[in-house]
From Swiss-Prot:
NCBIfam families: AcsF (TIGR02029), PRK13654.1 (NF010172)
Protein name in the entry: Magnesium-protoporphyrin IX monomethyl ester [oxidative] cyclase
Organism: Pyropia yezoensis (Susabi-nori)
Covalent S-S links between cysteines: none
Cofactor(s) recorded in Swiss-Prot or TrEMBL: Fe cation
Keyword ATP-binding annotated: no
Length: 349
């Protein structure tokens, strides 16, 4: 018997760290002039049309077994991983599908790119939801569509955030895949075998958003762009780091040290971003991860306070110094002198 999960049944609260659903200014995006980067868009569109993974997401006989042998805590953490991943992929599907619909008459090349990316995201979400089904659960994607709150971002911010989301997704998947390729004894479920090809979808999507950013030079070439790029780099890195700090046991179950894994992913994503953004974060500064560790501990303490039985008023008072410490350390990271990446735009590949 399968249980359908909807938002009201999940234990995770809506927080800054949960996967989000976005909308944007469709009119502004329709009016964008992409002619300065037209060749790149046409090349990317041909890549999307090729649909290299059309036959990849097909379940094989390894899925046809009972997973009751998984230790209870590991199973719970893995199901949460699947749910969060499915929600994030489905969020991308909804955004890209809506963009393709709104832009098809005004910017057909960009519209078709979004349509084909929505195909990929839907495929990923469906594959993840089938995996959830192996544990007699199913994520109610229709309920998610109707019930989730949508966050408005201007196109510029959508480009920054989604470029980084796709690139960090690539590095997360490929890092896990390469680790489990070397240590198959830690592959607790067959979905990890699919990550090598899967992550190439993420990489291609990231390349599309890189082309969008480069087609709008004012998104990259002034002091405000530098400030926003630093902000989004820090936001994406800190969100992943704080989330994964709560899920150390899951990474242990697949043979990974979550901190070392996150450090590797952050470094690689930062290198990728340096090919597009005018600045990169100085992740090799010893203070960078020191401050992130403090943020992760503060966030963990805030969660522990939420989970105890103290009166709400007492909880609120106890949280104040933790919030102050958390945001103060994030500000310290933001103020670490960034690296000017313009010098490597034409040399780093």
């Amino acid at each position: 018997m399968q249980t359908t999960i909807n938002n009201g049944q999940t234990s995770s609260k809506e927080t800054l760290l949960t996967p989000r659903f976005y909308t944007t200014d469709f009119e502004e995006m329709a009016n964008m002039d992409i002619s300065g980067n037209q060749e790149d868009f046409l090349a990317i569109l041909e890549e999307f049309r090729a649909d290299y993974n059309s036959e990849h997401f097909i379940r094989d006989e390894e899925f046809n077994q009972s997973w009751s042998n998984l230790e209870h805590k590991t199973k719970s953490l893995f199901i949460e991983f699947l749910e969060r991943s499915c929600t994030a992929e489905f969020s991308g599907f909804l955004l890209y599908k809506e963009l393709s619909r709104k832009l098809k008459d005004r910017n057909p090349v960009i519209a078709e790119c979004f349509l084909l990316m929505s195909r990929d995201e839907a495929r990923h979400a469906g594959f993840l939801n089938k995996a959830i089904g192996d544990f007699n659960l199913s994520l109610d994607l229709g309920f998610l569509t109707k019930s989730r709150k949508y966050t408005f971002f201007s196109p510029k911010f959508i480009f920054y955030a989604t470029y980084l989301s796709e690139k960090i997704g690539y590095w997360r998947y490929i890092t896990i895949y390469r680790h489990l390729e070397q240590h198959p004894e830690h592959r607790i479920y067959p979905i990890f075998r699919f990550f090598e090809n899967w992550c190439q979808d993420e990489n291609r999507h990231g390349d599309f958003f890189a082309a969008l950013l480069k087609s709008q030079p004012h998104f990259l070439n002034d002091w405000k762009a530098k400030m926003w790029c630093r902000f989004f780099l820090l936001s994406v890195f800190a969100t992943m780091y704080l989330n994964d700090f709560q899920r150390i046991d899951f990474y242990n179950a697949i043979g990974l040290d979550s901190r070392q894994y996150d450090m590797q992913v952050i470094r690689k994503t930062n290198e990728s971003a340096a090919r597009v953004f005018p600045v990169a974060l100085d992740v090799d500064n010893p203070k960078f991860f020191k401050y992130l560790d403090t943020c992760a501990c503060d966030n963990r303490a805030l969660i522990d306070i939420d989970n105890n039985n103290s009166p709400l008023f007492i909880k609120s008072i106890v949280k104040i110094p933790l919030y102050f410490s958390l945001f103060a350390n994030l500000l310290k990271i933001y103020l670490i002198k960034p690296i000017d990446s313009k010098t490597v735009w034409n040399t780093v590949r």
